[in-house]
């Protein structure tokens, strides 16, 4: 145990050292100042040339060649059709009507939302109509969270009230701290965050519709209290998970600091109440929080809305969302990018790596996106932010590999034709590493700001008259019917699926070898 604690302490000291170096350098240089803006003017001018979608309202005529019947399907102004309209198309052979088969929801919209707009072909991302580049340049995460939640940027007094409400809910119950401290010293921070979010449901029974009635969330006051609670407590829980990993006790939050400053304070103050993080370092983190705050119906947001549709409390719904974000295909991509860049090693190895990708022998992480078929607008901001950070602390050798890899890929027809551009994960991991965060903490840095997006969708779903408990259909492909037989009469085919060999520990083997008389 002593060696493990020593290792954790060494890792913690190393991380604090990197943070101290970065903080000292940032003290003399303003990140995101007017002299070197994140927002390049051409970004907005290019967006202004993209016209809003036209009115697509109309009708489709569907002719069923099985029966010769024709059906008229209404098309909404947004270009959608109701899936249930296809249920009326039947073969006349006692079927239940057509179902739409869409694995992965590639072309299915289960909700109508006004929170986030994405045009993947044009590389556009907007929160409530505001370009992400503009918000990253001029706003703060807390202000953006208000925008996502309530639809408009707050006035000065509204912002002050909002900041106060969030900061006043930043402390977590002692019982929750005890739960976190009881976890293994090497517990993955995302596992800690998922568990803690779920446990908050127990500590706040006043917010549970299962205990207080299904109409509980019809109260705007009740909703808003949960929003402030979660936004306030998320960084505190995340900091406790980080400190647990480093073998250190949790630190009380400070209500006098900004959102990002408070988070860094809890990580690095070592309990010194006079400690204050460098404001420029906090600004770097704040911009990253803005970029990760919302991204419409991604896997984890869809999970949050799916769970919330059952009427479950918001803490359980968000615990499920964070669990989805824990998946390596969703929240762990920037860690995969770092691993890839380390494997490439040097710029000289890039041509060989590129050929390996094209021959399907290697996998390129950080390129391509389910939605974007253009350069991810968040990646543009993050790359500029990375350049700022590395110009201050010195260039990590991997940034040279990353820049050269991007240049090689964007000059290769193989990637251009497939519209594989850098995404938000390509550079973010490099920034987090330079700031001293261990790779296992990267998805937590994704989850903290994404709470704002989850909560905005939760609030929106509560007011949406079309919200129903989510219950997707399936296409049954199993055996039609068979009858029960006693075990001794069953003939099992060798091709039948069966339990694989379950490994046991040596201690279990020792126990099984003993006498049972």
Residue ranges and their predicted role:
Residues 2-5, 26, 40-517:
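Hydrophobic alpha-helical bundle cores within soluble ligand-binding/oligomerization subdomains
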Residues 33-35, 63:
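Intrinsic-disorder/low-complexity regions
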Residues 1-28, 35-37:
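N-terminal chloroplast transit peptides
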